[in-house]
Amino acid sequence: MTDDTEYRCSFCGKEHHQVDDLIAGPDVRICSECVVLSCEIVEDRRNEALAKQDAFIKRKQRSVLEGLPKPAEIYAFLDEYVIGQQKAKRDLSVAVYNHYKRLVSTKSESENEVELSKSNILLIGPTGCGKTYLAQTLARMLRVPFAVADATALTEAGYVGDDVENVLLKLLQDADFDITRAEAGIVCIDEIDKISRKADSPSITRDVSGEGVQQALLKILEGTVASVPLQGGKKHTQYEQASINTRNILFIVAGAFSGIEEIISSRIGRSNMGFGSDLLRKDTDVFDQILPEDLRKFGLIPEFIGRLPIVTAISHLDGEDMIRVLTEPKNALVKQYKRLFSLDGVSLGFDHEALEAIVELALKRKTGARALRSVMESILSPIMFDVPSRGDIESVRITAETVAGGGPHLTMRCARSNYIRSA
C-alpha cells in the first residue's frame, strides 16, 4: 500500500496531481510552483544585496573622491618641485584628476551609465626640462606605483630587445608585485620620438623597430590584459607570467621631438626656425598650435596619435629658470648640498655670481637641468673630500672664482681664521 505523503511537496504540502511537476530528492520533494517561488525569493535577496553593495561602493566612491587631490592642489604640489611650465602643470593636474576620478567611477559603473574613456598624455619638450620629473612628482603625490621606460630599448616581436610588456614589469616591481596596485599606476615612456617612422622623419636614424613598436604599444595604451614575463626580456612559454589589465593605467608619453617646430612652422606659414632664433625661445607658442597631422608628419602613426588625446608642451629653460631650479624647489640642488655639508657641521653658501656661472656651464652642455648636478658635483667634490676630515671649518662659500677654477679656489671661514684651499 502506497503512502500518500510520499507524493506531497515538502514545502507547500500539495499532492502530485495538484501541481505540474514534483521533483523528488533524498527524503524531500519540491513542486514546480515552489521552485518558481524560491527563484523569486533568491532573486529578490540578490537584488537587495546588490543594492546594498552599490550603496556601499557609492559611499566609498564619495569618500575616495573627497580624498582625491583637486587640480588646484595637484598644481600647487607640482609648483613646489617644478620651476616654470605653468601650462604643462595645469594640463597635467586636470588630466590626472580626471583619470583617477574616472578610475573611481569605473568601479561602480553600470551598463546604463556613461563609460568614461582613458586619456593618456603626450609631453613634448627639449631634453632636461622636466618631462619625466613631472610624471614622477605626480606619482609621488598620489602615492601610486610609477615606472619609467625608454622607448628606444623596446622592439617588436622577432627583434633583439625588450617586448613592450616589459614597461609593465617595471611598474609591477615598483608595486611590490601587487597587481591591483600596479593596475592603478602611472607609466612614463620617454624618448617616444625616437621610434618614429623613418619615412616621415628623415632626421630619425633608427627605424628597425619604430612603427612596429608603436603598433605593439597600441593595445596597452588603450587598455588590454597583457601577459608580463616576470623574468624580463622576451616572452617565453617557460617563464612565469603575470596578467595585468592596463585599462586604468595612466600612460604619460614623452619626447623631445626635435625638428617638429619646423613642421608646425611650415604649416602655419612661419619662417624656418633654428635653435638660436627668437621664435624658438617662445617654443610653447608654436607647440600650442600642434595638430595630429604634425605628429603624423614627424613619424607617429595615426592610431598611436589617437591613443594620446592630451598633448602639452614643456618649454626651454633659460638662465633665470635654471637659477630658480637650483634654489627654489623643495629638493633644489643647493638645498641638497647644504644639507650634506650640515651633516658634517659645516654651513654652505653660494654667491649669486657663482650660481650664474654654474648655470652658464650647464647651458653649454645643452642637456637642460640635467647638467646642473654634474656641474655642481665637479665643483663641490674636491671640497667634500677635504671638509669631513677638518674640524676647524665652520662655513664654505662658493664664489664665481671657485666655479671658474673647477673647485680649487675656495674660501672657508672658521672661528679663528680664513682658510683658503688653492690648487
Curated annotation (Swiss-Prot):
Where are the bilayer-spanning segments? none
Q: Does the keyword Repeat apply?
A: no
Gene3D superfamilies found in the cross-reference section: 1.10.8.60, ClpX chaperone, C4-type zinc finger domain (6.20.220.10), P-loop containing nucleotide triphosphate hydrolases (3.40.50.300)
Superkingdom of origin: Bacteria
InterPro entries in the cross-refs: AAA+_ATPase (IPR003593), ATP-dep_Clp_protease_ClpX (IPR050052), ATPase_AAA_core (IPR003959), Clp_ATPase_C (IPR019489), Clp_protease_ATP-bd_su_ClpX (IPR004487), ClpX_bact (IPR046425), P-loop_NTPase (IPR027417), Znf_CppX_C4 (IPR010603)
A biological process (GO) of this protein is: proteolysis involved in protein catabolic process
One GO cellular component from the entry? HslUV protease complex
Where the record annotates domain ClpX-type ZB, the positions are: 1-50
Keyword set includes Plastid? no
Q: How does it assemble?
A: Component of the ClpX-ClpP complex. Forms a hexameric ring that, in the presence of ATP, binds to fourteen ClpP subunits assembled into a disk-like structure with a central cavity, resembling the structure of eukaryotic proteasomes.
State the name under which the record lists this protein: ATP-dependent Clp protease ATP-binding subunit ClpX
